Amino acid sequence: MSRKTSRGLGGLLFLFLTAGHAWAADDLPVGWASVAGGTTGGQGGATVTVSDAAALEPAAESTPPLILRVVGTVHLASPLRVKSNKTLIGVGPDATIVGGGIFLTKVSNIIIRNLTIREAPDAINLEGAAHHVWVDHCDLSKCTDGLLDIKRGSDLVTVSWNRFHDHHKTCLLGHSDKDDIRRMDTGHLRVTYHHNFFDGTQTRHPRVRFAEPVHVFNNYFKNNEYGVAALMDSGVLVEGNVFENVEHPTHTQYGDSPDPGRLVERDNLYIKSGTPEVRGSVVEPRTAYHYTLDRPADVARIVPQGAGVAR
């Protein structure tokens, strides 16, 4: 699965560069973004190439399905508010969004691939019950708040083959302990994180509230303060990952959140790391979708080789 997925991006880029409008039909997400109809982005729509904010913003904020090919560095003065049924894909190794990240609210069926996003308030933010979103092969760093935050009833998301670096609070999944947020988020926030490289980021990989099941598999955690935090009766399965020099691989109680979460860990590899906290049982993701694990012994090699842009 890992080799096919990693190669798929290169094949997709090749198709874009040669045909201008093609889509690799077998290049689909694994995990929560694949269920309940799946996530296809702008498939079936026109392909538009953009290289500045003046072209990107109206295209991303338009109604029709579109495949947006981002070339070079695009400077944004504010977050890009992407409408439903869009694919944003960077062309080559240097497609970059700077200054304003990507904001998804009350939208669905979005694919974000092969983009470097940095120096924004949030690199990517999902809220307002956004659903069916796939973030794949991106490089996210150096933002003011979060790199990839998912909250306010958002659901059915896959985060795969990304590199996160030069940041503190990385991936928030559920933003508040309050009762009204509990009612909003319970039954939602189902996210799969796989084959991501958390490269020296400090916390929140992710920090989870209320969601179940959240699936964290085959990721490489390196030089982090903590890995995964399951809080507020969330249920998280952490399997087949590598934790290297991570003080606290997992938490089930953290910060000022009053209630613990549930976390099951299995088949993880711990290198110069602390002891994981575990608690309770979690709904199995296999009841919702199929996935294939890479061997934990291979993760520290294949993830840095395959995660991030132009991989």
Region locations from a protein language model:
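Extracellular beta-rich repeat passengers
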Residues: 208-311
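Structural detector of coil-to-beta-strand junctions
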Residues: 101, 123-125, 147, 170-172, ...
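N-terminal post-signal-peptidase region of extra-cytosolic proteins
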Residues: 53, 70-73, 143
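Extracellular "leader-to-stem" segments immediately downstream of a signal peptide or signal-anchor
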Residues: 2-67, 272-311
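Short aromatic-glycine motifs in intrinsically disordered, low-complexity regions
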Residues: 34-40, 75-79, 230
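Extracellular beta-strand-rich solenoid/capping regions of secreted or surface-exposed proteins
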Residues: 57-65, 72-89, 95-114, 118-130, ...
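A cross-family glycoside hydrolase active-site/sugar-binding cleft signature
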Residues: 71, 149, 172-174, 207-209, ...
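Right-handed parallel beta-helix
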Residues: 85-93, 108-119, 130-144, 154-175, ...
